[in-house]
């Protein structure tokens, strides 16, 4: 891997992440690498300015934080095919990150320069708000997301999109219609709907009763949030599916589209949200020689396997 330009992105508000970021900058600059350091958080999004800079795209983005910091980087960098190397510094579960200890030892950058790593491609989703009339939708049911969005940027997600009722004063339910490849599947009344990737299957979707999917599988998980019908269950659909979610009921109700937990768009009555697999993948640098997704699950979720694997062998 070439390392002419590297972005070092650290979690805002984390002293440990900032300290590690400074160490990375010093080590890379000692190797003659040009480095740009920036913080990322709920109120700090460095990527629009970084992408607009004259320096151009980096060869690598080093992300120091938790999964949320990685998700923010992936939403902006996947479309540019920028690889992401992430470490869990100041984060929580860290399904997407390497352990912090792999930052130590001074051999990390040489490994990258010698191509001693793997590149994992993670499926992403993209979405657009459809503001057309019912007649226009009927005439062009498969209009591209770019056509629907016009000059607005598409919404991207590595984990999930979800739609929930939007009100400032109360917490109402909503009724959402799900259409898959032109066929109405169900009406979900409850707190909303989650559309997740296999990567996002261990996040909000799992907390809502959805299944866990191996990231080597390309599929889309549809998980209702607290549905008011016992027959409303999560479903898994093929990755090439086109999903359209519309708001039913009172014409004063609005729903909010969220992307990986970040604000996306507000859907007014009559509008729909169209979601499908993104053309680009998130490129994740993997350092482990023999990575095991199941070992990660047992460790992060404290399954019995993590206890059994740590037991001493019988003599």
Swiss-Prot record:
A GO molecular-function descriptor: metal ion binding
EC numbers for this chain: 2.7.1.23
Annotated NAD(+) binding sites: 67-68, 159-160, 189, 191
Listed Gene3D superfamilies: Probable inorganic polyphosphate/atp-NAD kinase, domain 1, Probable inorganic polyphosphate/atp-NAD kinase, domain 2
Cellular compartments annotated: Cytoplasm
Enzyme class: transferase
Catalytic center residues: 67 (proton acceptor)
Principal subcellular localization: cytoplasm
Substrates-to-products reaction catalysed: NAD(+) + ATP = ADP + NADP(+) + H(+)
Gene Ontology terms: biological process: NAD metabolic process; NADP biosynthetic process
Family named by the database record: Belongs to the NAD kinase family.
Role summary: Involved in the regulation of the intracellular balance of NAD and NADP, and is a key enzyme in the biosynthesis of NADP. Catalyzes specifically the phosphorylation on 2'-hydroxyl of the adenosine moiety of NAD to yield NADP.
Protein name: NAD kinase 1
Lineage: Bacteria, Bacillati, Cyanobacteriota, Cyanophyceae, Synechococcales
Gene: nadK1
